[in-house]
Amino acid sequence: MKKQLLSALIGASLLAPMAASAADYVIDREGAHASITFKVSHLGYSYVVGRFNDFSGDFSYDAAKPTAAKVNVKVNTLSVDSNHAERDKHIRSADFLNTSKFAQATFTSTTVEDKGNGDLVINGNLTLNGVTKPLAINAHAVGEGQDPWGGYRAGFTGTTTFAMKDFGIKMDLGPASSHVELDLVVEGVRK
């Protein structure tokens, strides 16, 4: 009996390293395989669309246990780009992002919900304009695998919406323009 138990323990200890575990990834911003874009309704007739050109982050992910995933992102708010220099200057002002005081926004996940078929809800805290609030991102695991350069990558998309007033942005653009929609594309390179 002792020999069988010992054999089982040895066998289990040999198999343990083969069990799936979360891998750590760094967001591939140098290869331009990630983006943070936003859109805000313009008077209810159209949209102002922009992006943040400078951000960084990392995440851990295991497809076998997506609820254990973790995400951390830092955004340089000075890098906002709506393809219009004067508007960008206004977005950076105290009317909106107040980048002279708050040059960085952050998102840190707290929990991840697995909705099946690669769909996830990433719950976390967004700090923007000096205000931290909970935010849920509807995400989808696009895929993962070896790249042609000997690395391993995982990619995701995500969307979320938040009210500007929740983050201390009091500029009144009218009721049709009170929310910001974020579209996220993330490709990470395994560390």
Curated annotation (Swiss-Prot):
Q: Which residues form the signal peptide?
A: 1-22
Taxonomic superkingdom:
Bacteria
UniProt GO cellular component terms: periplasmic space
InterPro entries cross-referenced by the UniProt entry: Lipid/polyisoprenoid-bd_YceI (IPR007372), TTHA0802/YceI-like_sf (IPR036761), UPF0312/YceI (IPR023480)
**Localization, UniProt:** Periplasm
Q: Name one Pfam family in it.
A: YceI
Q: Does the keyword Ligase apply?
A: no
Q: Which UniProt keywords apply?
A: Periplasm, Signal
Tell me its family. Belongs to the UPF0312 family. Type 1 subfamily.
NCBIfam families per the record? PRK03757.1 (NF002994)
Q: What is this protein called?
A: UPF0312 protein Sbal_3041
Give the species this sequence originates from: Shewanella baltica (strain OS155 / ATCC BAA-1091)
Please spell out the taxonomic lineage of the organism that makes this protein. Answer: Bacteria, Pseudomonadati, Pseudomonadota, Gammaproteobacteria, Alteromonadales
